[in-house]
Structure formats: structure tokens, C-alpha cells
């Protein structure tokens, strides 16, 4: 129409399958239509909106049931969860040499366990949803578990020097590292339960934690490296805690004194090399800066 311009703020939608759903529960999305121009006050039809619906021809596997779920873990590639899925007794294994990117699609996946193979170099990525499971990795440095933007109802792993990255996650129950796991927490992380540290862990970004427990360590010199905005409610040390196990605080802000454990026990908390601490401020926050 002369004298009038119009546009949508979003012209394409990627919707989950509506198969086996009622109309009122079918997936939806919205877009806004804006108009401008000198003819905006005229009272007449401005045009026709055409909606084209096409099937998804990508290489992403839609997971609707346990059979689809097993197939996704038997094959590499990409998968997306179509609906909430409960596999309480389902023990999933990612096969040797396979990589899987699994988009939980804001849905909930509940399974008994997920494991990586005994001899492979797999990368498993879980993103954008809620999951409750036990993850078992099997001691190869080439294995990677990446959990991105997820709520975790308990995450533990039997893990020997494999690599685990948690990014922008909320963990509702206990989270622990065991048998040499190398963990990296990035972005915004909120653990409402207890985090138990046995081996090397690196945390960077905004991190909120109810209880941090450093348990008995019988070998090695595990280090917990912190940087970013760190808020920890309670520190807990096992009775046989070794002085060699260090908590190292880098640049960032802390709600505890980051250069000593305030009860004086073992002196397990220290500043990273080249850092200084100031504070606390009126809110009890200490600031660590790198020189």
C-alpha cells in the first residue's frame, strides 16, 4: 500500500512437533507486526499475511519416546527432546567415538544414568532443559561432558581425569567430583545443594553455592580455583582434610575472606598469585584484584 510500511520482528519460527498433542497444547510462537508511514490513518485493507509451514529437513533427531532416546545415544549427531520423558530405569551409553549434541528444548529428561564408553573420545553436550541423572565417565582425557543452561536434579560422576564443563546451570541437589574429575564451571551457576570437591575444579563467573565440602583426600594435591562473583554459604572440611588441598581465589568478589579460612583451620584458602584483596564493604563483600 502506498504511503505505508510494515514488517514483522520475526519471520521464521522453529517449533517442536505437534504430533500427539491437542490443539490447546500444540507448540506456539509469536511475532510483532509494526507499521509506519503517512497513510497510517487510512481505514482500509493493508495487505495479506501468508504463513508457509514446512517440515524440518535438518539432521536433528526428534526424541519423543524411549526408543528414540536409545537411538540418539547409539548414533552421533544432534537430537532434540520433543516432550518430557521419564526413563527411571534407563541406563544410556554414548558409544565409542560418538559425539552427541542433545537439546532438551526446555523439557525434562529423567533417566537412571548416562555413561560414556570405556575406550572412546566422545563429547556429550546437554543443553536448555532439566535433567536428573548420574553421569559416568571412564578415565580418558579425550572424553568431554558439556552441560549448558540446564537445571540439574543431582549430578555426580564416577570420573577419572575426563573433562566436565557446566555453563549457566542450576544444580538442585548434591554435586560432587570424584576420582580425579576435572570440572569447569562457567557463566552463571547456582547450586542449592552441596558441592563436594575431591579433585581439580575451576569455577569462573557468577557462582552461588549453599555448602562447599572439601572431603578427605588421600593422594595428590587437588586445587579448587575460583574467580568471578563467588557466594558460598558454608565451608565444610572432612576431619582428615589435607593441607595440600588448596582453594585458590582469583580476581572477583567474595562473601568470605578469600585469603584465609576464617576459623584458622589448615589455612586451605589463599589468594591466587599476583592478586590482592580489599574489604569487606558494608555488605560483607571482599574484592580481589589482579596486580
Where are the predicted features?
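Extracellular/surface-exposed low-complexity segments
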Residues: 1-74, 78, 187-188, 204-206, ...
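Solvent-exposed loop/turn tips at the surfaces of repeat/solenoid architectures
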Residues: 1-6, 11-13, 18-21, 26-31, ...
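Generic detection of short hydrophobic beta-strand segments and adjacent strand-loop junctions
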Residues: 61, 92, 112-114
Amino acid at each position: 500500500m502506498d504511503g505505508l510500511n510494515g514488517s514483522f520482528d520475526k519471520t521464521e519460527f522453529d517449533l517442536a512437533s505437534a504430533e500427539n498433542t491437542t490443539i490447546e497444547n500444540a507448540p506456539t510462537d509469536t511475532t510483532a507486526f509494526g507499521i509506519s508511514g503517512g497513510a497510517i490513518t487510512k481505514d482500509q485493507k493493508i495487505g495479506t499475511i501468508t504463513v508457509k509451514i514446512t517440515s524440518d529437513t535438518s539432521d536433528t533427531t526428534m526424541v519423543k519416546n524411549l526408543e528414540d532416546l536409545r537411538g540418539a545415544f547409539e548414533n552421533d549427531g544432534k537430537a532434540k527432546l520433543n516432550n518430557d520423558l521419564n526413563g527411571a530405569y534407563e541406563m544410556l551409553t554414548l558409544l565409542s567415538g560418538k559425539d552427541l549434541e542433545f537439546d532438551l528444548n526446555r523439557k525434562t529428561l529423567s533417566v537412571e544414568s548416562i555413561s560414556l564408553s570405556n575406550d572412546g573420545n566422545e563429547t556429550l553436550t546437554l543443553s536448555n532443559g532439566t535433567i536428573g541423572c548420574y553421569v559416568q565417565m571412564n578415565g580418558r582425557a579425550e572424553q568431554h561432558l558439556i552441560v549448558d543452561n540446564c537445571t540439574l536434579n543431582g549430578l555426580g560422576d564416577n570420573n577419572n581425569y575426563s573433562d566436565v564443563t557446566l555453563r549457566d546451570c542450576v544444580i538442585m541437589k548434591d554435586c560432587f567430583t570424584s576420582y580425579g574429575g576435572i570440572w569447569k564451571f562457567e557463566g552463571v551457576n547456582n547450586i542449592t545443594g552441596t558441592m563436594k570437591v575431591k579433585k581439580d575444579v575451576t569455577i569462573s563467573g557468577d557462582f552461588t553455592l549453599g555448602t562447599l565440602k572439601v572431603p578427605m583426600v588421600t593422594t595428590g594435591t587437588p586445587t579448587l580455583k575460583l574467580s568471578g562473583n563467588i557466594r558460598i554459604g558454608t565451608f565444610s572440611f572432612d576431619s582428615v582434610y589435607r593441607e595440600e588441598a588448596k582453594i585458590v581465589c582469583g580476581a572477583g568478589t567474595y562473601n568470605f575472606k578469600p585469603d584465609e579460612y576464617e576459623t584458622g583451620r589448615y589455612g586451605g584458602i589463599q589468594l591466587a598469585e599476583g592478586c590482592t584483596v580489599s574489604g569487606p564493604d558494608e555488605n560483607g563483600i571482599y574484592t580481589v584484584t589482579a596486580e
